Amino acid sequence: MLAFVAGLGLSMLSYPVHAAPASGSDTVQGLFDALLVTMKHGRTLGQSGRFAQLAPVIRRSFDTASMARLSVGPTWTGLSEAQRQEVSESIGRYMSAIYADRFDSYEGQKLEVTGEQPVASGVMVKSRIIKANGEPVKVDYMMRRNGEGWLISDVYLDSAISEVATRRSEFAAILKNDGIDGLISALNRKADVLTGTTARSF
């Protein structure tokens, strides 16, 4: 009974509630707030629990359809709407699994938005992650307007390494050898391994 009550408490973690983000910085701050809540309960939640908590946060913070289109490259134009939806969901699920794996516990880390600047395709939000040992890591978020809010369309580590470009390079060989269905299966397998869950709608 105690185990059930404890599990119920974790399933009802209090995440910050945000209105439609008025700026790119608001979106990134909302992501950071949710990451910190998950990290502080990370060991108790476990990998699959962190994934369950973060998946909806990733869904509302990232433009996974745009990231999928750019990551898949020219193959995208030949996909049906159903395939586009499926690969977007599998990429979002894989991203959620990666975040659940990387942000697994809290040891005094800080996640800070440091500013934003307009760019041709939207705005770039500047941030830094202060590791437990005090080492800073610069992370920039490319933001695109989506309706009344802003979504993350790419992430740059140390202002240089594009997540979308990295994924496109990783996906190219899979697409060449196994096609889009092979890529979707590979992404879901990787997420399964990281989280101990089974693929379902993202």
Feature map (PLM): residue ranges:
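Bacterial N-terminal signal peptides
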Residues: A3-M12
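N-terminal signal peptide c-region/cleavage motif recognized by signal peptidases
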Residues: S14-P16
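Early exported N-terminus immediately downstream of N-terminal targeting peptides
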Residues: P21-Y99
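Surface-exposed, polar/charged faces of alpha-helical domains
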Residues: A22-S23, V37, H41-L45, G49, ...
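Soluble periplasmic/extracytoplasmic beta-strand elements of cell-envelope proteins
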Residues: Q29, L36, E112, M124-R128, ...
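Surface-exposed, charged secondary-structure patches
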Residues: Y94-V137, L187-F202
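Short beta-strand edge/turn micro-motifs at domain boundaries
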Residues: P136-T166
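Low-complexity, intrinsically disordered terminal/linker segments enriched in charged
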Residues: Y156-F202
